[in-house]
Structures are given as C-alpha cells and as structure tokens.
C-alpha cells in the first residue's frame, strides 16, 4: 500500500479552498448572457470552445492532489446539477464557492463547523420552500420557447425549435438531438410508432419512386417466432385476402418457402402484403411486440400464451390507418387500439421508468413511452464547422433538459433575481445557537452571489449598485444583463426553471457543508523519481544485450 500524505485542520481547508477557487473562477466567467467562452485544449483535434459550466468543470484536473480534491468536490456540484436539471451548473458552482468561502471565515473565527452546517441546511430548506411558492407553471409554446432560449445561451432559434418539438410530440414525448449533414438546423417529427426494421424483401415496395411499401387501412399480424413453413401461415393469409385489406406481418423472421410464397403472391396481385422483422432483442422484443399489439388492438400470437399461428383468426389481427415501410424503418400511424388500454400501458411504462436504476434501460423505456404517446421529434443541428456543431449540439441538449425541468416544476425570474426574492424565506429559519444563526446568514450572503457574478461578467456595471436596486424592487423586477436595463424579467423572457435553481442551491450547499466539516485530508504521497530503481545497463537481463 502506498504511503499517504495527511493535512489537518486549517491547513487542509486552505488547500481545498485553493482548488475550489481555481475551478470556480474558471467556470463562473461563463455565467449570464454576458458570460465569456472558455477554450479547452484537446490532445486530438481542434480545441473546444464552450460557455457551459459543467463542460469546463469536467476538464479541470489540478497537479496538487489536495487542491485537486477541492476542485473535484465542486465539479461534483456541477455534474449532479446537470444530471438532475440539465442547466444551472455555473450557478451551482458560484453558490458552492460563496458558501464555502463565507463558512471558512467563520470557522477560522472559532465557529463550530457542525452547527454552521445545521444552520445552512435549515436555511436551504426554507429558501427552497420560498422558491416553490413564487414559482409559476408553464404550458404555452411562447413560455417554453423563452426557457429554451435562455438555457441555450440566448439563442432564440434553439428556443423556438424546442417549443415546436414539444408542441408536436407532447411534454412526455421523446426529443432526440442529432448532428445534421448540412449547415441548416431543422426539426423532423416522426408521427406514430416507428421501429428500426425495414421490409424483408424489396418486392414488397408499392411506391417505386420513394422505394416504400405503403399500406392503407392495414391489418397487422404479430408473431414472436420465425415463420419458415407456409402451412402454418396459410389460414390467416386466406382470411386477410378475403377481406381485401393489406396485411403487415411482423415476426422474428420469415425465411425460405414462406417468404418466397408471400413474395410470389404479392407480385401476382393475389395478396396485398408486406413483412418485417420484429424490433429489439430478447425480453425487450417481447415488450415491444406487446406495445404494438396494444397500439393496434391486436394480439401477440405467442405459444407461451397458448396461441398457435395456424389457429389464428381475424380477431387476433391489429389494425392501423396507415403503415409506411422503407428499407430501414417501419412506421405505424393511427393504430386502432383501445385508448384506455394504451393509457394503462403508458402508465405501466412510466412506473418502470421510476423504478429503473440503469440509464440505458431508462432511455429505452422512454423511447417506448414516446412511441405509444404519439411520436418522436428529431432536432438535426447544423453548423459550418465541426467545432461549432459540437458546441451548438451541447447547448441544445442542455436547453432541452432545462425546458423539461421547467415543464415539471415551473419557472421563476432569471438573472439571479429569484434567489434574491427567496431570501425572504430565511425569516422562517430557526437557529438553536449563534453558530447556526451564522449558517443561516452564510446562505443569505451566498444567495446574492449569482447576481453579483452576472453583473461582473458584463464588465460595465457595479454589482453592489445593481444588487441594492434589485433588492429594493419586488416580484420579477430585476436587472436584464443582456440589455443592461431594469425591468420585469419574466415579461422580458428572462426566466429559469424552478428545478434548476432549486437543484443548484441544494447541491451547492451539500458539497460546501461537507468541505466545511472536513478536518483532515488524505492523499497518496507522490512517488519520488529519485527513489526509483535504476535501469539495468543495456540489453535485457539474461540475454547479454540486444544487437
């Protein structure tokens, strides 16, 4: 086991503070509409330019191990806030630095760290309650666009696109962000249920121009095994042919004689039919087939449930207004399933999402949820250079996350004003002793810091003057750093999701409290190069040298 280096008391806290300050000072220059960019060197490829706090924080590793521990603790604040709310990472970093700085002063003056922590915790609880009380719900497209615009660093194009996407697929719908092939940024909406399986044979194509199979008022056969024997498929094929409606066959696979017979009958005009493989694999495939069955009002023909393909009747078939199939995807539009069954399935998947502990499983469940809810929106992000594309894509992902947060918990005035107004909640915070009261006052002072930093980044106005003027106002009145005017910020579109502001404060206070109550810090001693064993002279041992 490697030898350790240990620092105690004020020595440990001072070193941690240096690390906290180095990281926070690099991150906080990005705060607000007047925030600056940070250029990050990449060992491979061009440097990355970003105005995203968590991206800056994740790049910082300090040489001194004790300083690095302080930096990593604050990096955790930014990361956790980003994971929970998608935005507010810079605000969280600024708050953590302010709470730790003010707390350290008091610890040095003799305050008990554990009482400071208790005071901080009580203060945060009351501030969060106050934030919730001043929060307002959003639903309109205009309000959603405002949140998206602010979170995308004041890019109205991105805000409008996100609002449009949410309008099309609903607030529970899946919105994915992808890199476009060209320079234009556009929104593409896939209506209905789409899965990534194309036709099994190009002979199923009904529209040679688009190379798509289009089935109107289609019947849908859903089978969870391979079909290789025509005999078991024949009864249901004859019944669907008599109805005169086109048939889509979804099965694990169709091969050999069965596929050849279907294709020949399609070419002769005897059958209107198309066949695709079932989506997904394993248990996920079973679940997706069940989703398709519920959406279309059909039944999954599965021997596990006691159903046999040769005994299938028309009652087992699902129905849809339209099915479009190309070589890669199948889209089922307007399935004829019962709405109450679809709603029950949606609620079941939502329950699974809440219980899921895996990010991958959660993502797949959300995709299934969106397909049942009515569609997937894809934001294709275009830019003139790769560096700009990556930066813009990251901003869109952040803005999308923050917009979802706003829909969940509502919005408050932006620009640091909501935190100033939430100071009122501290009147309800109780303290058992003077040190706890000091902890409450630390939060009172820290809540002003984001506004001070936003103003400082404009480089033209005195933070103390702005703070005093905002304090004297009421409600949503505050300083708009983009126009450098005092106005109603919500009316001006300067808003923050309540969840973002709340998460930033809670995470900052949590990590700053841990740092304040730290009495010792332990790290590995750096290996001294001088103590390393000398390399043996030329050649390899036992081989008398290599030539």
From Swiss-Prot:
InterPro entries: Chaperonin_Cpn60_CS, Cpn60/GroEL, Cpn60/GroEL/TCP-1, GroEL-like_apical_dom_sf, GROEL-like_equatorial_sf, TCP-1-like_intermed_sf. It catalyses: ATP + H2O + a folded polypeptide = ADP + phosphate + an unfolded polypeptide. Keywords: ATP-binding, Chaperone, Cytoplasm, Isomerase, Nucleotide-binding. GO terms for molecular function: ATP binding; ATP-dependent protein folding chaperone; isomerase activity; unfolded protein binding. It is an enzyme of class 5 (isomerase). PROSITE patterns: CHAPERONINS_CPN60. GO terms for biological process: protein refolding. ATP binds at residues 30-33, 51, 87-91, 415, 496. Belongs to the chaperonin (HSP60) family. Together with its co-chaperonin GroES, plays an essential role in assisting protein folding. The GroEL-GroES system forms a nano-cage that allows encapsulation of the non-native substrate proteins and provides a physical environment optimized to promote and accelerate protein folding. PANTHER family: 60 KDA HEAT SHOCK PROTEIN, MITOCHONDRIAL (PTHR45633). Forms a cylinder of 14 subunits composed of two heptameric rings stacked back-to-back. Interacts with the co-chaperonin GroES. This is Chaperonin GroEL. It comes from Chlorobaculum parvum (strain DSM 263 / NCIMB 8327) (Chlorobium vibrioforme subsp. thiosulfatophilum).
């Amino acid at each position: 086991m490697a030898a350790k280096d240990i620092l105690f008391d004020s020595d440990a806290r001072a070193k941690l503070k240096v690390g906290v300050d180095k990281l926070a000072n690099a991150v906080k220059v990005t705060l607000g509409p007047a925030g600056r960019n940070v250029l990050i060197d990449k060992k491979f490829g061009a440097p990355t330019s970003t105005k995203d706090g968590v991206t800056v924080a994740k790049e910082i590793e300090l040489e001194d191990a004790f300083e690095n521990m302080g930096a990593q603790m604050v990096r955790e604040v930014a990361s956790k806030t980003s994971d929970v709310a998608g935005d507010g990472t810079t605000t969280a970093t600024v708050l953590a630095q302010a709470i730790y700085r003010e707390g350290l002063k008091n610890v040095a003056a003799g305050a008990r760290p554990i009482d400071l922590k208790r005071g901080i915790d009580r203060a945060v609880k009351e501030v969060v309650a106050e934030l919730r009380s001043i929060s307002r719900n959003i639903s309109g497209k205009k309000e959603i666009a405002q949140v998206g615009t602010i979170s995308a660093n004041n890019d109205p194009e991105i805000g409008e696109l996100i609002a449009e996407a949410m309008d099309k697929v609903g607030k529970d719908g899946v919105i994915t962000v992808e890199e476009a092939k060209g320079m234009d940024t556009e929104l593409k909406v896939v209506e209905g249920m789409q899965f990534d399986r194309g036709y099994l044979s190009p002979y199923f194509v009904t529209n040679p121009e688009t190379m798509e199979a289009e089935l109107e008022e289609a019947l849908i056969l859903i089978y969870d095994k391979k079909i290789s024997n025509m005999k078991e498929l024949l009864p249901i094929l004859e019944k669907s042919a008599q109805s005169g409606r086109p048939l889509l066959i979804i099965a694990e696979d169709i091969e050999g004689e069965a596929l050849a017979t279907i294709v020949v009958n399609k070419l002769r005009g005897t059958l209107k039919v198309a066949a695709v493989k079932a989506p997904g694999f394993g248990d996920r495939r079973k679940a997706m087939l069940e989703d398709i069955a519920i959406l279309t009002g059909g039944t999954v023909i599965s021997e596990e449930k006691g159903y046999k393909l040769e005994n299938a009747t028309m009652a087992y078939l699902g129905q849809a207004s339209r099915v479009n199939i190309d070589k890669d995807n199948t889209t089922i539009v307007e399935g004829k399933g019962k709405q109450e069954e679809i709603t029950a399935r949606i609620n079941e998947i939502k329950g699974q999402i809440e219980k899921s502990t895996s990010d991958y499983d959660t993502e797949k469940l959300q995709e299934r949820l969106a397909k049942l809810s009515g569609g997937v929106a894809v934001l294709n992000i275009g830019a003139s250079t790769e560096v700009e594309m990556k930066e813009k894509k990251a901003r869109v992902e952040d803005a999308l996350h923050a917009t979802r947060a706003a829909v969940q918990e509502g919005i408050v005035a932006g620009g640091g004003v909501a935190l100033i107004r939430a100071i009122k909640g501290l009147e309800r915070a109780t303290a058992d002793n003077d040190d706890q009261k000091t902890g409450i006052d630390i939060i009172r002072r820290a809540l002003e810091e984001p506004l001070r930093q936003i103003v400082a980044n404009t480089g033209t106005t005195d933070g103390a003057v702005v703070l005093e003027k905002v304090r004297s106002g009421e409600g949503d009145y505050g300083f708009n750093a983009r126009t450098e005017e005092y106005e109603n910020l919500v009316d001006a579109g300067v808003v923050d999701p309540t969840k973002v502001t709340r998460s930033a404060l809670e995470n900052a206070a949590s990590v700053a409290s841990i740092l304040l109550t730290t009495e010792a810090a332990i790290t590995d001693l750096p290996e001294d190069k001088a103590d390393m064993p000398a390399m043996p002279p030329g050649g390899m041992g036992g081989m008398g040298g290599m030539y």
